[in-house]
From Swiss-Prot:
Residues binding ATP, per UniProt: K314
Record organism: Listeria monocytogenes serotype 4b (strain F2365)
This protein's name: Methionine--tRNA ligase
Subunit structure: Homodimer.
Enzyme class: ligase
Keyword hit for Flavoprotein: no
CDD domains, alphabetized: Anticodon_Ia_Met, MetRS_core, tRNA_bind_EcMetRS_like
The EC number(s) this enzyme carries: 6.1.1.10
């Protein structure tokens, strides 16, 4: 759980490497950090939110040379692109650090000198396999693929990333990592929330610390675009000290004006992609230990946004341009999708279908319709004025208030644990419950009976009040929609928009005037048209195919032997019952008859493609010997096979002539 003991809050993203245009992956990390920064500000914290760019290195030097411009001109151009995207995303960062800035360079030089003087850095020689793309050395055993000559000598290979490596031998300064290994493990054990999710910590210990930490090369001589090592200018400070130290140099560490450093350090949470967790939870804390500085309270390693065919790549034609999504669908649609669709900490899949569905079902239908109906009814029944709050009048009022109180409590717990998708799911349950309240109270019926006027007024005040609270809870995630809700409800007092106001009820002054005619905050999209549009835009950067693509993509999966296939037990099953899974938009819970004398429960992510009643009685094919797994608190004992086309799943049906439990061969 994030710390609550002080009124400052320091949060960082990684500094991004400007070797290309900012994309949706960068947007994901930075929007997540922005949501947490906005949440903490709402709760009264003095927040410092840092992001920036890592602008030194061999790859930058090579890119600038290709363009025929200086390194500084190159990074200035790319850094400006990142800052433009943050502005477009309305990121509320406090500062933007660039490693080419003098404030950073001066502090890095002092850090290097201190570590050298106290013996944590020494001069030696390094020989190893180096990847220019990764800007990292690898031992032979770490290589994903090794190339050998006819004599069996290793002459090259590929890094774990798939990038080519070359043998490099050079003089280098080294950091004594092993000196601090035991102390680091002790810190892990005494601070269980230092690395989250938990799986990341286990990976660091088992894969990197237990095998033994090797001393780390922290300077380079094969390129010169970087900060010169004090007293030995043929060396430049390597990324581990140069880039990682930005989190303290941005605060004025080791300068005459270190007020911000004294105020905000240590960081409360540092958000990083899972591919750089090692650098931030091994190299970075060891460096801080050597400098005798406190460690960050938490490093949170989030997953990747993937496409159906893997990571984004221009060659695959699956690159998602955040500018395109913002310009066509609005900023809040993108911010909502990024933080609702993917559980923070796990990998997630971007599909045009899911994006359009989120806009239509969640934003336009659930939230938009609730606001439209409420404003319309207040205009129709009370001449546009919100009635005075009179407590709980109808039999449904107290239930609605209790539900709100519970959601607020759950929401805060989820946000404090960086579980953004869970918090949004809880918030949407309040939106759904408020929509249900309209159906329960039937204000159109109450309006026909003058004796029910008090009840009708109570319904209107409860609807307006819930919408006000929903708008407050939306503020960490969406930058424009909350203001539009406040505007349509006629809420001008700032106190009604503050965090503390959500704990009470009936805060809206009687007689507050709503707008005469509300406008849809999220117009409904033509699903098929918009899915096609996004798909075409994603393909726009792909090179022209060598020949017309086949109707079905060629499989690129590795071949297996019959002995591997025989391990899979496929059985025919009859669908006896299907239910929707609460708080899980995509899951259906099946009760299947596999001829075992009892029904077997299997969960499948096909809820968006079928209504439960469509599936009852069908014969399906099930992987029956799959290891049971718990999903959303429900046990799933198998997998139902489906086929996929154009993003839509279709259950593979078996012949009705086959008995339940028949083996599929």
């Amino acid at each position: 759980m994030l710390p609550e003991e002080k009124n400052t809050f320091y949060i960082t993203t990684p500094i991004y490497y400007p070797s290309g245009k900012a994309h949706i992956g960068h947007a994901y990390t930075t929007v997540a950090g922005d949501a947490m920064a906005r949440y903490k500000r709402l709760k009264g914290y003095d927040v410092f939110y840092l992001t920036g760019t890592d602008e030194h290195g061999q790859k930058i030097q090579a890119k600038a040379k290709e363009r025929g411009i200086s390194e500084q001109e190159y990074v200035d151009e790319i850094a400006e692109g990142f800052q433009e995207l943050w502005k477009k995303l309305e990121i509320s960062n406090t500062d933007f650090i660039r490693t080419t800035q003098d404030r950073h360079k001066t502090s890095v030089e002092k850090i290097f000198e201190q570590l050298l003087e106290q013996g944590d850095i020494y001069l030696g020689e390094y020989e190893g396999w180096y990847s220019v793309s990764d800007e990292e050395y690898f031992t032979e055993t770490q290589l994903e693929e090794v190339y050998k000559d006819e004599n069996g000598k290793v002459i090259g290979g590929k890094a774990p990333s798939g990038n080519e490596v070359e043998l490099v031998k050079e003089e280098s300064y080294f950091f004594r990592m092993s000196k601090y290994a035991d102390r680091l493990v002790e810190y892990y054990n005494s601070h269980p929330e230092f690395i989250l999710p938990e799986s990341r910590k286990n990976e660091m210990i088992n894969n990197f610390i237990k095998p033994g930490l090797e001393d780390l090369a922290v300077s380079r001589t094969t390129f010169d675009w970087g900060i010169k090592v004090p007293g030995n200018p043929k060396h430049v400070v390597y990324v581990w000290i140069d880039a990682l130290s930005n989190y303290i140099t941005a605060l004025g560490y080791n300068t005459d004006n270190d007020t911000k450093f004294q105020k905000y350090w240590p960081a409360d949470v540092q958000i990083v992609g899972k591919e750089i967790v090692r650098f931030h939870t091994i190299y970075w804390p060891i460096m801080l230990m050597a400098l005798d500085l406190p460690l960050p309270k938490m490093v949170f390693g989030h997953g990747w946004i993937l496409m159906k065919d893997g990571k984004m790549s221009k060659s695959k034609g699956n690159v998602v341009d955040p500018y395109m999504l913002i310009d066509r669908y609005g900023l809040d649609a993108l911010r909502y999708y990024l933080l609702r669709e993917v559980p923070f900490g796990s990998d997630g899949l971007f599909t045009p279908e899911d994006f359009v569905d989120r806009v239509n079902f969640d934003l336009a239908n659930d939230l938009g319709n609730l606001l439209n109906r409420t404003v319309a009814m207040i205009n129709k029944y009370f001449d546009g004025e919100i009635p005075a709050y009179q407590g709980n009048v109808t039999e449904f009022d107290q239930t609605l208030v209790d539900f709100k109180n519970n959601v607020v409590k759950e929401y805060e717990g989820s946000m404090d644990h960086m579980q953004f998708s869970v918090a949004l799911n809880q918030l949407w349950s309040l939106i759904s419950r408020t929509n249900k309240y309209i159906d329960e109270t039937a204000p159109w019926t109450l309006a026909k009976d003058e004796d029910k006027r008090t009840e009708l007024a109570s319904v209107m005040t409860h609807l307006a009040e819930n919408l006000r609270i929903i708008a407050v809870l939306l503020q960490p995630f969406l930058t424009r929609t909350p203001g539009e809700i406040f505007l349509q409800l006629g809420l001008q007092e700032e106190n009604l928009k503050k965090w503390d106001s959500i704990y009470g009820y009936g805060e809206i002054p009687a007689g507050t005037t709503v707008v005469k005619k509300g406008t849809p905050i999220f117009p409904r999209l033509e699903a098929e048209v918009e899915v096609t549009y996004i798909q075409d835009e994603m393909k726009g950067s792909a090179p022209a195919p060598a020949k017309e693509a086949a109707e079905v993509e060629a499989l690129e999966t590795p071949q297996i032997g019959i002995e591997d296939f025989d391990k899979i037990d496929l059985r025919v099953a009859e669908v006896k019952q299907v239910d929707k899974v609460k708080k899980a938009d995509k899951l259906l819970c099946f009760q299947l008859d596999l001829g075992e004398g009892k029904l077997r429960q299997v969960l499948s992510g096909i809820a968006e493609f079928y209504q439960p009643e469509e599936l009852i009685g069908k014969k399906v094919i099930v992987v029956s010997n799959l290891k049971p797994v718990k999903l959303r608190g429900l046990m799933s004992e198998g997998m139902i096979l489906s086929g996929e086309k154009d993003g839509k799943l279709s259950v593979i049906e078996a012949s009705s002539a086959l008995p339940n439990g028949a083996k599929v061969k």
